[in-house]
Every structure is written in C-alpha cells, then in structure tokens.
C-alpha cells in the first residue's frame, strides 16, 4: 500500500515538472525548438490532502487484511474497485444519506405557528392529569405531591423522597437504611432499643437526614420526636420513638416498608398528542417546533446545509471509526420524534415519542388505536423496508428521528385466512378516533 501511494505521488510530480531537456542542451536551443504558438501548460493537478490519504490508507488497510489470506498479489485496480464496492454497499444499507424512515423536515419553528405538525412537546402529570409544557413539569409535580399529604401522608412522603432528591444512589442508600430500622422493629418488637432512633446518630445524619421527605415518612408511619436524656451529658437528645399504637400493628410497618422499597420517582408522562388525519399528499411533510431538537436554530441550519453534502461524503474514503463517530453524533441531535403511520385506507395516525424510546412503544401505540387489536400487523419504513422485529431497539437507532412516515400492513397470511373464511376485517381504527379525524394542513 505504501508503495502504491509513493508511485502515485511520484507520478503527479513527474507530470507537473514540464517537458524534458537534454543535459548538453542549452536554454537557447531549447527555446528555439519550442513552437511559438504553443499553449501555456495546464496547472498541475493538486494531489490528495493528508486527511484523504490517511482515510484512503485506512480503508485500503482493511481490505488488505481481508485479502491477506488469498493467493497471489492484488492489483491496484482490484483494490480501487473493492473500495468502491464497499462504499456503495454502505450507501445501499443506509438507503440514502438520511435514515430510511426519515422524511422532509423543514427548519424548526416557534410554538404557535399555524403550520406546525404539533404545537409543541407536552406532558401529563400522573397525579392530576394536567397537560404541561416541558418547563412546567417539575413545579407541577412537586405541588401535586405536597397537596397529596392531606389525603395520604405515607404515599406522599415516599413520593417526595424519590422525586425531590435527584441523586438516586443516595436515595437507595437512605431507603435501605430506613428499611433496616423497620426490619429490626418487626423482628424484635420486645426490644425497646430498636423502637428509638437517635437523630444525631452518624448513620442517620449521613444517610437519612440529608434526604427530603424522610422526616415526613417517619412521622406518617407512627414515629414521634421526643427529647430523651443522654448518657454523660446534661442536655437531652432528640429521638424518633415509635408510638405504642403503631407497635401494636406490626403488619402496618411491614406494609409501609414494602411500599417504600417498591416506589419510583414521579415523572411526567409524555403526551402522545394522538391525532388522526384524512389521506393527504402532505403526509411526509413535517413542520416541527424547536422542542424536538437538541440543537440551537443556528446549529440546525448548519445541519441542513451539511445534509445536502451527504452524497459527496459517501464518495470520500473514511475509516470505520470515523463513520461510527458520525453516527453517534447523529443519535444525540434529537430529544423527540414525530411519527405518522399510513393505514391501508390512506388515513394517518400521528403520535409523539422520545427519540430513545423503544420500538415496542410504537407498536403498542398503533395497536391501541385498532378496532381489531388482536390481528398481527407490520410497520414499514419509507421504501418498503420492514422495521426490525427487535422491539427493544431505540427509535433513533432505527433512523426514525426527528420524524418519520411509516406504512401499516396487516400480516398477509392472517389476512388471507380471514378472506378465505368469507369475512372482511372491520374498520381499521376505533370509531371514537375516526369521529375526530382532521384534515392535514
């Protein structure tokens, strides 16, 4: 390979050196021999840049490793052809410079624009059912948890522990320590020392006192703060002491412990904003708000300009590491994705998803809208490419960001069985969805 590039460079230098000259020939003789109307020599062709040479060398090295087991030498033409085939194969796999499922996405617009495919990204509070903007999530959930103390203080304190404290490792350590306290009381109800927890204890201070919601939890399950005399000091110390009433109901402590260990942070749920549209030639056109992108407006414009150069990039020799780095950069550009599913009757089902959400969520979303939700079906990306059967794949890994138009297809074998039995599948979507069908603008 090194010899190939050395010969390539030498050939360029030789051709750019100009006409030959004899050693004994003078400059005057040379000028006399030249034709007076001879056109000016063309400028020498510029050689490949260092980056292009390095990338070419890396690609050729990969081919050399693959071909090292073959008999006989490999010609330079064969190497070039093999590199060209490899690049063409990569382009075929990817389908195009864009992912197979993506469609035309214009520049992001501000929320409130009349032609946005969705007005923005919204969430639903799991406690109140309120629809929230992204910047309203945390404040609304905290307020709902605090209001929940009036109806269920135990559940509210547990939600506060998991939700108000962001360091989940510290939360787990604190929760496990509280569970240990409750286990000791449950296993040794006759031991008075287990019914008292010293607040100034080092373990309590480092693992429990630093967490929001822990004091509310102790008080909600029956502990009371009491000042008790301390050994070898005049001033009393503060303890949590379990009340006699709670001690008489050990099963309640066990239930509260299990509830504490099984809890999770309260998170706002992404609002799918499910909509159904009439058949439209604009199905693949998406006007997305800025919330869908993890980029500034300037960065998005630059990405769109670079997208037009994708074909040219495919013709440049790149190492595998370079390609993987570009792919990973692309996966991090988007937070959300808007998907449309074209049904056999031409109607469109639309929903919003996280970019890193699993493919199974899309199948579940479509199945919930079907009148015959028990029938198997397939989803096809643009070009008729069937989506992966691995429902654990993330949507950005499937190229379905920041938007995509999918095609719905019944399982043909099952559909033929239904028709053979003299039946026809019911209307695809549920009646309540069809009653709210819209025109896509």
UniProtKB/Swiss-Prot annotation:
Topological relation to the membrane, as annotated: Peripheral membrane protein
Entries under PROSITE patterns matching the protein: UBX
Low complexity: bias regions: 52-61
Function summary: May negatively regulate the ATPase activity of VCP, an ATP-driven segregase that associates with different cofactors to control a wide variety of cellular processes. As a cofactor of VCP, it may play a role in the transport of CAV1 to lysosomes for degradation. It may also play a role in endoplasmic reticulum-associated degradation (ERAD) of misfolded proteins. Together with VCP and other cofactors, it may play a role in macroautophagy, regulating for instance the clearance of damaged lysosomes.
Phosphoserine modification, residue list: 96
CDD domains on file: PUB_UBXD1, UBX_UBXN6
One of the record's GO cellular component terms: extracellular exosome
Assembly: Interacts with VCP through the PUB domain (via C-terminus) and VIM motif (via N-terminus); the interaction is direct. Forms a ternary complex with CAV1 and VCP. Interacts with SYVN1. Interacts with HERPUD1. Interacts with VCPKMT. May interact with DERL1. Interacts with PLAA, VCP and YOD1; may form a complex involved in macroautophagy. Interacts with LMAN1.
Region described as VCP/p97-interacting motif (VIM): 51-63
Tissue expression as described in the entry: Enhanced expression in testis.
Species of provenance: Homo sapiens
Protein name: UBX domain-containing protein 6
Record bears the keyword DNA damage: no
Keywords of the record: Cytoplasm, Cytoskeleton, Endosome, Lysosome, Membrane, Nucleus, Phosphoprotein, Ubl conjugation pathway
InterPro entries attached to this UniProt entry: PUB-like_dom_sf (IPR036339), PUB_domain (IPR018997), Ubiquitin-like_domsf (IPR029071), UBX_dom (IPR001012), UBXN6_PUB (IPR042774)
